Amino acid sequence: MGMPPLLFCWVSFVLPLFVAAGNCTDVYMHHEMISEGQPFPFNCTYPPVTNGAVNLTWHRTPSKSPISINRHVRIHQDQSWILFLPLALEDSGIYQCVIKDAHSCYRIAINLTVFRKHWCDSSNEESSINSSDEYQQWLPIGKSGSLTCHLYFPESCVLDSIKWYKGCEEIKVSKKFCPTGTKLLVNNIDVEDSGSYACSARLTHLGRIFTVRNYIAVNTKEVGSGGRIPNITYPKNNSIEVQLGSTLIVDCNITDTKENTNLRCWRVNNTLVDDYYNDFKRIQEGIETNLSLRNHILYTVNITFLEVKMEDYGHPFTCHAAVSAAYIILKRPAPDFRAYLIGGLMAFLLLAVSILYIYNTFKVDIVLWYRSTFHTAQAPDDEKLYDAYVLYPKYPRESQGHDVDTLVLKILPEVLEKQCGYKLFIFGRDEFPGQAVASVIDENIKLCRRLMVLVAPETSSFSFLKNLTEEQIAVYNALVQDGMKVILIELERVKDYSTMPESIQYIRQKHGAIQWDGDFTEQAQCAKTKFWKKVRYHMPPRRYPASPPVQLLGHTPRIPG
């Protein structure tokens, strides 16, 4: 009598109920008889609805409390599986899996019977029970064949160290037997090779170790001419990595004799694929093809997954050819670390570009905020007396020099000295009477941290620099030898610097310029306006407290007389 595969949830539709019970539809009840002490899994899937967008819970009737999802608990839910690590006699009972989606609810039940079975104790009364972990397999007399150890567990369980037994004795590699993992190859089969076999495997789950056993009742069978057992060359009980939602076609290649009329097909849960997915045809068997060779025929029958869904993973799809069978198990691909790496680098690059853009756009405000938040009142130890040396054009009388004087001698000190706390040396205001121009520039510029130069389009306004070589040398020394930072302010937009002194051209080329907007209103005399923010940005960090607020200066434009 054929036995259902070990630990495999969709073995057969044992008891189709399809009776509405409350708000859920009972799909079927499956009967399992397992010996105590065994790890036991059961996978709950119902292809019409378990498409990844469902809520799935296990509970033991009559309790409505869900089975724990804590993987350290002996009985727990692992995704769609219920896992017993291991089974105990008191676990006998009915367990229900409830599958809900947005529009429907289904129940699948297992009637679990746990009994005591002693390993290699044939005298025990219960040892003759046909349990779910006992299989019946056939071997062909006079040929070579193989036995299969069926092990289906969730991915959280690691299986290794598979051993084979005949009776109670472990099978070692010999001319007769060749254990190869889940397969036991048997050569020169005769009647004496029938009997009781078993396979055991070590199961590791979260560091805990268990032993899984399958019991196999083997019968031998005479096969004459035309009765050769088909050989499935692919699949080989292997796994296939496939993306969720993709299309997949898998060929089953079978070699068989020309006289054999064996049925070749794909099954899932011991049901023909086309019958199992009759309503949706998402997974279907293809048309069989064959190729005649000298001594045999190569048959190919494929299975097509139009769309791979979550319930397909970890679920065996088996190709059958008479007594031969081989399965595939679909697995989700391992994470593509290259994609994560490229994505991470792209995100980092985007972040870096964004930070650079934000900094370049708001760097003036960022720097000024940082200075105001983390400022220090301690004077720098650089032996400098002034924060900036102000050099501006001298206009002849009866000219527009009144506006320049107002900016330099009134507004500039008002904003930078009184509001911001800087100390300025203004050429034309702070030198001692009778000092030579070259001496003033050369001596005092060395006591300043910045050089602030104001320029206007009129080249004649800089005649004091253009015609006096010593003054140009003093400014040039400050720029080149002392490495002083320069703030160049255009009183009006200067389109052509070619007529300017070489020192001014050098400053413009190396440091750029800030353009004064010509606004003399009281609002423009605030340190928080755009122009003054740019000036403060180029100034050194403020070292002195600002003066108390004073009334801002008004400006009366000069009326030509």
From Swiss-Prot:
EC number(s) given by UniProt: 3.2.2.6
Boundaries of every Ig-like C2-type domain copy: 22-113, 128-215, 225-321
Residue positions with a glycan: 23, 43, 55, 111, 130, 231, 237, 253, 269, 290, 302
Signal peptide: 1-21
Keyword flag Cytoplasm: no
UniProt tissue specificity: Predominant expression in the lung and epididymis, with lower expression in cerebral cortex and testis. Expression in the brain is non-neuronal and associated with the cerebral vasculature. Not detected in any cell line tested.
Cytoplasmic compartment spans: 359-561
Keyword Nucleus recorded: no
Domain TIR: 384-539
Residues at the active site: 470
One Pfam short name: TIR
Disulphide connectivity of cysteines: 44-97, 149-199, 252-319
Membrane-spanning segments: 339-358
GO molecular function annotations of the record: interleukin-1 receptor activity; NAD+ nucleosidase activity, cyclic ADP-ribose generating
InterPro entries on file: Ig-like_dom (IPR007110), Ig-like_dom_sf (IPR036179), Ig-like_fold (IPR013783), Ig_sub (IPR003599), Ig_sub2 (IPR003598), IL-1_rcpt_fam (IPR015621), IL-1_rcpt_I/II-typ (IPR004074), TIR_dom (IPR000157)
Main localization category: membrane
Subunit structure: Interacts with IL1RAP; the association is enhanced by IL36B indicative for an functional signaling complex and inhibited by IL36RN.
Function: Receptor for interleukin-36 (IL36A, IL36B and IL36G). After binding to interleukin-36 associates with the coreceptor IL1RAP to form the interleukin-36 receptor complex which mediates interleukin-36-dependent activation of NF-kappa-B, MAPK and other pathways. The IL-36 signaling system is thought to be present in epithelial barriers and to take part in local inflammatory response; it is similar to the IL-1 system. Seems to be involved in skin inflammatory response by induction of the IL-23/IL-17/IL-22 pathway. Receptor for the interleukin IL36G.
Protein family per UniProt: Belongs to the interleukin-1 receptor family.
Domain notes: The TIR domain mediates NAD(+) hydrolase (NADase) activity. Self-association of TIR domains is required for NADase activity.
Protein name: Interleukin-1 receptor-like 2
